[in-house]
Regions:
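Conserved N-terminal structural module of periplasmic/extracytoplasmic solute-binding proteins
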Residues: 20-87, 278, 336, 385, ...
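A structural signal for short loop-to-beta-strand junctions that line the ligand-binding cleft
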Residues: 69, 77-78, 106-139, 166-169, ...
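Hinge/lid segment of periplasmic solute-binding proteins
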Residues: 84-134, 144, 149-155, 268-270, ...
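Short, solvent-exposed loop/beta-turn-alpha elements that line the ligand-binding surface or hinge
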Residues: 101-109, 187-211, 262, 274-283
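Extracytoplasmic/periplasmic solute-binding protein
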Residues: 124-128, 133, 153-205
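Glycine-centered hinge/linker elements that transmit conformational signals in sensory
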Residues: 156, 198-230
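Extracytoplasmic/periplasmic substrate-recognition and gating elements
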Residues: 224, 261-324
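Long, aromatic- and glycine/proline-rich binding clefts that accommodate carbohydrate-like moieties
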Residues: 270, 319-371, 375, 400-403
Length: 405
């Protein structure tokens, strides 16, 4: 054997041995500021599966756009984190893959969190956290929170005379006001038995929807829908009033907890109040979860990672570090969390909450309904006329989309 042949064989042997020893590498996109909450689980996974996991922080609401650009080039991640409405968008754009193990293990999760990421009977995300509107109250000002909206209205009227506020909420947003409408039987679109959203079954102009917005208009006329909370700075103003003890209670999501803790507010958490018709007030349920890129070349390892990240121990630790509530049933029932206010309230509130439809048409629904709610609060037009106009606008948009597609 000549020197060239020996050298060639040696080179081939080195290349082959390198391929055998090469470690699989997963690239995971996490939301900004959240990588640290899964760091411990990632380290354990790397040891058990003898692999490397690179966790990169990317703004969650830009991940679909980034995946669409980078995925086809082979530069994208294996795993992304998406809100449930964006899971629907990513699925429609053929950017993400079905997650096979979830077909068997979905019973370990709250049913409505599973429904929010299921399309045509297939699951496209592993739910990481759920969010819905809840009520925060200042324990220094209110020892026992009222249980009905009418009680909060009466309390708010008394406090306004003293220059203070009772219950604050961003009522001009459809996202908030839907919690009223839902309690009166209104809905956006019906969901068929197979899980398909029926765009021909529209329910934001029903008699119940009208009645719910009469409640809102009544509060507005009593000067309990505050202009100071309108606009992009409304949440900041609400925070200022609550943290300075000028407001007794606020309707907000669990994402506000971190700020309230930093402000040193002695707050309690409870479910939203009961409506005048006796039904619970309940808003949308938002689910965030992990999905697998269509272009991932490590799909099996990615599925192993997603199963591992939501094992009881890891999901429990993630909750304690992030205060993001996982829809993992065993965690919600963990004895160590029996007295955890946030866990208990989110679990109760999510029973009545409604999944946000994961369809492209929702971006237009938000816009139209925000304008409709503004008219209910600020204009004297009949509520049924306002909602009828909104319906016509939304239906026209849907028909145009259907024709163009």
């Amino acid at each position: 054997m000549n020197k060239f042949s020996k050298g060639l064989l040696l080179s081939l042997a080195l290349v082959y041995s390198h391929e055998i020893l090469a470690t699989e590498r997963l690239v995971v996109w996490e939301d900004v500021g959240r990588a640290s909450t899964i760091a411990s689980a990632v380290k354990d996974f790397e040891k058990i599966y003898d692999c490397d996991v690179d966790v990169l922080e990317k703004p969650m609401y830009h991940q679909v756009e980034l995946l669409e650009k980078q995925g086809p080039k082979g530069e994208g991640p294996d795993v992304v984190v998406l809100a449930s409405d964006m899971v629907g968008v990513a699925k429609d754009k053929n950017l993400i893959s079905q997650i096979h193990f979830m077909q068997v293990e979905n019973s370990q999760y709250l049913p409505n969190s599973i429904a929010s990421v299921t399309f045509d009977g297939e699951l496209y995300s592993v739910p990481k956290t759920i969010e819905t509107l809840i009520l925060f109250y200042n324990k220094d000002l209110l020892k026992e929170p009222p249980t009905t909206l009418e009680e909060y209205v009466d309390l708010s009227k008394k406090l306004r005379k003293k220059g203070k506020y009772g219950l604050l909420a961003k009522w001009e947003l459809f996202y908030t006001t839907y919690a009223l409408m839902n309690g009166y039987g209104a809905y956006i679109f019906r969901t068929d038995n197979d899980g398909t959203i029926n765009l021909n079954s529209y329910g934001l102009d029903t008699d119940g929807a009208v009645e719910s917005l009469k409640v809102l208009r009544k509060m507005s006329k009593a000067d309990l829908v505050y202009d100071c909370l309108s606009g992009v700075d409304g949440y900041n103003r609400m925070y200022e009033l609550f943290s300075s003890k000028k407001a007794i209670a606020v309707i907000n999501g669990p994402w506000a907890i971190e700020d309230y803790l930093k402000a040193g507010i002695n707050f309690g958490i409870t479910t939203l109040p009961t409506l005048p018709n006796g039904n619970p007030m309940a808003g949308f349920l938002g689910t965030k979860g992990y999905s697998i890129s269509k272009w991932s070349t490590h799909k099996d390892l990615a599925e192993d990672f997603l199963r591992f990240i939501n094992e009881h121990k890891n999901a429990l630790l993630r909750y304690k570090e992030s205060r993001q509530v996982p829809p993992v049933i065993s965690v919600l029932q963990d004895p160590s969390l029996a007295n955890d206010e946030l866990i208990q309230v989110i679990a109760q509130q999510s029973v009545h909450a409604v999944n946000m439809p994961s369809i492209p048409e929702m971006s237009y629904v938000w816009s139209v309904m925000d304008k409709a709610i503004w008219k209910v609060i600020h204009a004297g037009l009949p509520i049924d006329h306002i909602l009828e106009d909104a319906r016509k606008d939304i239906e026209s948009y849907i028909q145009t989309r259907i024709k163009n597609n």
